[in-house]
Amino acid sequence: MSRVKRGVTAHARHKKVLARAKGFRGQRKSNYRIAHQAVMKALTYEYRDRRTKKRDFRSLWIVRINAAARSEGVTYSRFMNGLLRAGIQLDRKVLADIAVRDKAAFSRLVEVVKGQLAA
Protein backbone atom coordinates (compact mmCIF):
# COMPACT_ATOMS: atom_id res chain seq x y z
CA MET A 1 0.00 0.00 0.00
CA SER A 2 1.29 3.44 -0.86
CA ARG A 3 2.13 6.06 1.72
CA VAL A 4 -0.10 9.12 1.99
CA LYS A 5 1.60 12.38 2.79
CA ARG A 6 -0.83 14.94 4.20
CA GLY A 7 1.33 18.03 4.34
CA VAL A 8 -0.57 19.83 1.59
CA THR A 9 -4.05 19.25 3.07
CA ALA A 10 -2.89 20.05 6.61
CA HIS A 11 -1.26 23.26 5.41
CA ALA A 12 -4.43 24.25 3.55
CA ARG A 13 -6.58 23.55 6.61
CA HIS A 14 -4.27 25.53 8.89
CA LYS A 15 -4.20 28.38 6.41
CA LYS A 16 -8.00 28.48 6.32
CA VAL A 17 -8.25 28.63 10.13
CA LEU A 18 -5.57 31.32 10.39
CA ALA A 19 -7.37 33.35 7.72
CA ARG A 20 -10.54 33.25 9.84
CA ALA A 21 -8.51 34.34 12.88
CA LYS A 22 -7.26 37.44 11.08
CA GLY A 23 -7.76 40.49 13.29
CA PHE A 24 -7.54 38.53 16.54
CA ARG A 25 -4.95 39.63 19.12
CA GLY A 26 -1.75 37.94 20.20
CA GLN A 27 -1.19 34.26 19.44
CA ARG A 28 -4.87 33.85 18.64
CA LYS A 29 -4.04 35.06 15.13
CA SER A 30 -0.73 33.28 14.50
CA ASN A 31 -0.58 30.02 16.49
CA TYR A 32 -2.75 27.36 14.83
CA ARG A 33 -3.81 25.51 18.00
CA ILE A 34 -4.84 28.67 19.82
CA ALA A 35 -6.33 30.21 16.68
CA HIS A 36 -8.44 27.09 16.09
CA GLN A 37 -9.91 27.34 19.60
CA ALA A 38 -10.53 31.06 19.15
CA VAL A 39 -12.22 30.54 15.78
CA MET A 40 -14.47 27.78 17.15
CA LYS A 41 -15.48 30.03 20.06
CA ALA A 42 -16.11 32.91 17.65
CA LEU A 43 -18.36 30.67 15.55
CA THR A 44 -20.44 29.72 18.60
CA TYR A 45 -20.81 33.40 19.52
CA GLU A 46 -21.72 34.17 15.92
CA TYR A 47 -24.45 31.51 15.86
CA ARG A 48 -25.83 32.55 19.26
CA ASP A 49 -25.81 36.26 18.52
CA ARG A 50 -27.65 35.94 15.21
CA ARG A 51 -30.58 34.82 17.35
CA THR A 52 -29.98 37.33 20.15
CA LYS A 53 -29.92 40.20 17.65
CA LYS A 54 -33.58 39.60 16.78
CA ARG A 55 -34.60 39.85 20.45
CA ASP A 56 -32.44 42.92 21.02
CA PHE A 57 -33.89 44.82 18.08
CA ARG A 58 -37.47 43.96 19.04
CA SER A 59 -36.77 45.28 22.56
CA LEU A 60 -35.24 48.46 21.13
CA TRP A 61 -38.27 49.06 18.89
CA ILE A 62 -40.64 48.57 21.83
CA VAL A 63 -38.65 51.04 23.98
CA ARG A 64 -38.73 53.64 21.19
CA ILE A 65 -42.46 53.21 20.54
CA ASN A 66 -43.20 53.38 24.27
CA ALA A 67 -41.18 56.59 24.69
CA ALA A 68 -42.89 58.26 21.73
CA ALA A 69 -46.34 57.07 22.80
CA ARG A 70 -45.88 58.27 26.39
CA SER A 71 -44.83 61.70 25.12
CA GLU A 72 -48.23 61.76 23.38
CA GLY A 73 -50.02 60.70 26.58
CA VAL A 74 -50.70 57.00 26.00
CA THR A 75 -48.83 53.88 27.16
CA TYR A 76 -47.28 51.32 24.83
CA SER A 77 -49.79 48.57 25.61
CA ARG A 78 -52.81 50.84 25.13
CA PHE A 79 -51.24 52.23 21.94
CA MET A 80 -50.73 48.75 20.47
CA ASN A 81 -54.25 47.72 21.51
CA GLY A 82 -55.67 50.81 19.84
CA LEU A 83 -53.78 50.03 16.63
CA LEU A 84 -55.20 46.51 16.67
CA ARG A 85 -58.75 47.82 17.14
CA ALA A 86 -58.27 50.41 14.39
CA GLY A 87 -57.09 47.70 12.01
CA ILE A 88 -53.73 49.39 11.43
CA GLN A 89 -51.21 46.67 10.61
CA LEU A 90 -47.78 48.20 11.09
CA ASP A 91 -45.03 46.14 12.66
CA ARG A 92 -42.90 47.39 15.53
CA LYS A 93 -39.92 48.05 13.28
CA VAL A 94 -41.91 50.45 11.09
CA LEU A 95 -43.64 52.07 14.07
CA ALA A 96 -40.29 52.71 15.78
CA ASP A 97 -38.92 54.22 12.57
CA ILE A 98 -41.96 56.51 12.25
CA ALA A 99 -41.64 57.49 15.92
CA VAL A 100 -38.00 58.49 15.44
CA ARG A 101 -38.11 60.09 11.97
CA ASP A 102 -41.62 61.52 11.55
CA LYS A 103 -43.14 62.90 14.76
CA ALA A 104 -46.16 64.36 12.95
CA ALA A 105 -47.15 61.03 11.41
CA PHE A 106 -46.75 59.30 14.77
CA SER A 107 -48.94 61.97 16.40
CA ARG A 108 -51.64 61.26 13.80
CA LEU A 109 -51.41 57.56 14.60
CA VAL A 110 -51.81 58.35 18.30
CA GLU A 111 -54.91 60.45 17.54
CA VAL A 112 -56.45 57.52 15.66
CA VAL A 113 -55.60 55.22 18.57
CA LYS A 114 -57.09 57.60 21.14
CA GLY A 115 -60.28 57.72 19.07
CA GLN A 116 -60.46 53.93 19.08
CA LEU A 117 -59.79 53.69 22.81
CA ALA A 118 -62.46 56.29 23.62
CA ALA A 119 -65.09 54.47 21.54
Curated annotation (Swiss-Prot):
GO terms for molecular function: rRNA binding; structural constituent of ribosome. The keyword Oxidoreductase does not apply. One of its GO terms (biological process) is ribosomal large subunit assembly. Pfam families: Ribosomal_L20. Keywords: Ribonucleoprotein, Ribosomal protein, RNA-binding, rRNA-binding. The keyword Transferase does not apply. PANTHER family: 39S RIBOSOMAL PROTEIN L20. This is Large ribosomal subunit protein bL20. The lineage of its organism: Bacteria, Pseudomonadati, Pseudomonadota, Acidithiobacillia, Acidithiobacillales. The gene is rplT.
